[in-house]
Each structure stands twice: as structure tokens, then as C-alpha cells.
């Protein structure tokens, strides 16, 4: 089984220049659930009263999925989560030598003792505990297994494998997660960053290697270059055989809401949700699409509330012109159509813009 634990309201909001208000958070949380998220990570209680109040309002929505907070592995952060009434927590701890040196003076014994104390307290409160392995991709797997073994003994439920600085490749991800998952210590959750454009690919490689869950953010917002995209991971899980019922209305509203609230434009060619990703210009492709809608599309655009189109551009062929002429009631003459193509290519090249059907008619 594979699930999505979306962190748009936590790591997504850590995008520079992004700040969601309470109303936006509530709408995003509800739409994430409706669009198919299995769990939500919704904030950092230790930030203070306003954040805690927002988290309480999200909990008051009574969404039928787990709601999690992000915390440092400290008693103070845990107490802040408990005050909100949360039942699931991520307890973040550095696991790479470089961050352990910076945050714990290289003292792994002190780190493990602190982690143990906080996990014990969290389990005493009957919380779901995810151990967040900060900078896992620069850590030694043997140390990660030591942490996972300790966590399992203390009753922790999950280990979050964080590619904190976004340096993983899909191949390396698969190797590392396969090694960790084969130990059968804790369920593994992927947390990938997009610094080299591989966040979604790495999340999928993690699933393939045995990871149970992955963090995502809507349209891939997040620290620096962002995180694995919710919509991309959601649809990619179908490639792995997961049954997914797409709520296209909720997904479309979710994308629009997050784009507006974060002031992030949705590129027209953004995978899964860009409005032009089902636009076919190449003459060879259009000819194939006229014969079968499966020729050059990975899934039906209507599933996501999108539409296919056949713009009249530089690379258009006779099939495109015939399609558009017929759409306005003109029975095309193939010889005339073929003579039009060079002229259309010249016009489009000069003005850097496709022709409309009405312009073709003229």
C-alpha cells in the first residue's frame, strides 16, 4: 500500500515569500482531503499561539484522515503539539554527521538519549510518532538503522527519510530505501526536495523500493526549489498500480487556491495540471490522435478537467488544418491545405503566435 502525507501547509508554507492566512489554510486542508491526500502535515505548533490556533481550527474540520504536526525532537515542541490536541507528530532529529556536528556537537549519544525521552513521552500520550530523519540522504544507512531500531523498540510508527538538500537521484534513492525497508523496522516515508529537479522521481523510486508514504506539496512549492508535487505523485501512484478515484473538481480548485494563496503561477506546461499539456501541434502527433486518443496521451485529460487541443503552429500538418476547417463547416481541399502550410509556418514564425481557427478561415 502507498499513501500520500501532504505537507503543503507546513513545508509548502516555508517557501520564501509564502504565508497562508487561516481561511486559506482551512480551504487548502479540506481540498487536499477531497483531492485524495491520505494524511496532512499542517504546521509547527512551537511557532506560537497563532499557529496553534490555526492548527486547532484545522482539527475542528474533523477531516477523516490523520492530521500531523512537525516538531523538533524536544519536550517543548511536543508539549506545544499536545496543547493543540494533535494525535500524530513528526519528531525531527538530524541524522547526518554534518548536521549532528552543527546541532549536537557531534554527540550521537546525547542525540539518541534526547530522541528516546521525547518518543517515550509521545507514546505515553498515545500519539502516532514519525521520526523525521533530517538530512537522511547524507547520512550513513547503518546509523539510520540504529535510529529505526531504537524507534521500533520505543513504539514509534514511522521513519521519515529526508533528502533535505535535494541531492538524491532515483537510482540512489532506490538503493538506500531498499536497504532500509528490507530491515522491516519501521514504515518509511519519503521527503524529497527538488534542487536538481528530481523530487517527484525520487519519491516514486522510494515507493518502488518499499516506502509506505511520501510527503508532497501542491504544485511542488517548498523550501528552495520545492518538494515532490502532490498532483504528480498522486497520478504517478496509478503507474504503480494504486486504484485512484480522481476528484477533478477538487483538484482543480486546490491548484487554483494554492497558486493564488502562494502567488505562484501555474505554468501552462506544468505536468499533470498545466492547461497546455494536452495541446498537440506536431503534424505526426495530430494525425495519430485523429485515429486514436491513446496515441500520444498518457491519460484522458477529462479526468482532471482539462481539454485537448490542436493549435495551428509551425509544426502543424494537413491533419490539423483539416480538423479546424471541418470544425467550422468547411470541407477542405487537400491541395489547398498543403499549399497553406508554408505560409502558415512563415506567419507563426514571424509573430511567435499560433493561428486561430477564424484566422485560418480568412
Enumerate the predicted regions with their spans.
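Alpha/beta enzyme core
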Residues: 2-4, 11-40, 57-61, 75-188, ...
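A mid-to-C-terminal "edge-of-domain" accessory segment
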Residues: 2, 244-362
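Short beta-alpha connecting loops at secondary-structure transitions
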Residues: 100, 163, 216-222, 235-244, ...
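Catalytic alpha/beta core domains of metabolic enzymes, predominantly
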Residues: 168, 174-291
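Active-site glycine- and acidic-residue-rich loops that bind
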Residues: 69, 135-143, 193-198
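N-terminal active-site wall of soluble small-molecule enzyme domains
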Residues: 46-63, 69, 74-79
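Short hydrophobic alpha-helical runs that function as membrane-insertion/retention elements
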Residues: 66, 160, 213-216
